[in-house]
Swiss-Prot record:
Disulfide bonds join 107-203. It is an enzyme of class 2 (transferase). Its EC number is 2.8.1.13. GO terms for cellular component: cytoplasm. The active site is at residues 107, 203. It comes from Pseudomonas paraeruginosa (strain DSM 24068 / PA7). Catalyzes the 2-thiolation of uridine at the wobble position (U34) of tRNA, leading to the formation of s(2)U34. The record marks 132, 347 as: Interaction with tRNA. This is tRNA-specific 2-thiouridylase MnmA. Belongs to the MnmA/TRMU family. It is found in: Cytoplasm. Residues 102-104 are annotated as: Interaction with target base in tRNA.
Amino acid sequence: MSESAPTPRRERVIVGMSGGVDSSVSALLLQQQGYQVEGLFMKNWDEDDGTEYCTAREDLADAQAVCDRIGIKLHTANFAAEYWDNVFEHFLAEYKAGRTPNPDILCNREIKFKAFLDYALMLGADLIATGHYVRRRDLDGRTELLKGLDPNKDQSYFLHAVGGEQIARSLFPVGELEKPEVRAIAEKHGLATAKKKDSTGICFIGERRFTDFLKQYLPAQPGDIETTEGKVIGRHSGLMYHTIGQRQGLGIGGLKEAGDDPWYVLGKDLQRNVLLVGQGNDHPLLFSRALLASRIYWVNPVELERPRRLRAKVRYRQSDQDCVLEKTADGYRAVFDEPQRAVTPGQSVVFYDGEVCLGGGVIETAEAWDFGGRP
């Protein structure tokens, strides 16, 4: 990185400062590139239940320390009402329906690249920036969303529902870097967040147990745990606490006739409030050949008059999977070349053409893989 004075630019950029190292380095890099840089810390959750779980205060202090260090102004904004209406209520509704949602995807679409973008433009910004590990490319009059260069940190999965017009107004400085480089830059420039641990999990839950958090908002409905043969072998405390492919926390044990293989969640019978389980990590009912997706968001319009061969992820960090995507009367159907394990309704499937993230949608149903005739 050159230490020479940057050429001043006229564009004013407001960086979403989370109090983490990625957004900190993003602000620094943009400043070095000559942009007029300011920061903005957004509060998306009201801490009515105390501060022991939520790190917002600490994060704000870290963001302020970084802004002071590099000499930029830090704005603050409260988007808690927008978050509740556009993200959290949907999150609760999905769990109530027995599905497993991903609120981070909706948060990016509705808060970071909508509420924050609108607020930044109101403040007079030309562009916003975030610390996401993605890239953008302007091509043929549209802006594409590309995977981040670091395959271990690529976050395009979480940004697939953000439109090209919003991507065009956004910069992603660390998307061109690998994580160790980002930390090295932060350390070299004495940023307070250089060694700060990456945040994990859902932001509004923090470090508390997920079941304890959910109980505050949704009443638990206990029911039976059944095998695929219909035998009741236990009780669950609520379908919403379980997800497809889950092994831990089922409380099944001591069944003499069952053998030693661990039990896994295979499905949920919502009408009967029954959790369906089976033994073995490779149980056939854990694998799907196809899925149906709805609520599709494309970064840019995608032509699907006929089936199209693409690659897809059905969860974050999964390697890209070959599939054929077609539009149907009920949504979009993706048929995979290889069996897909633990395809989970409520989670997102995201489609790629090479390094370009095209968009994705919410998984509605999965079709079981027919292992007949296969080795």
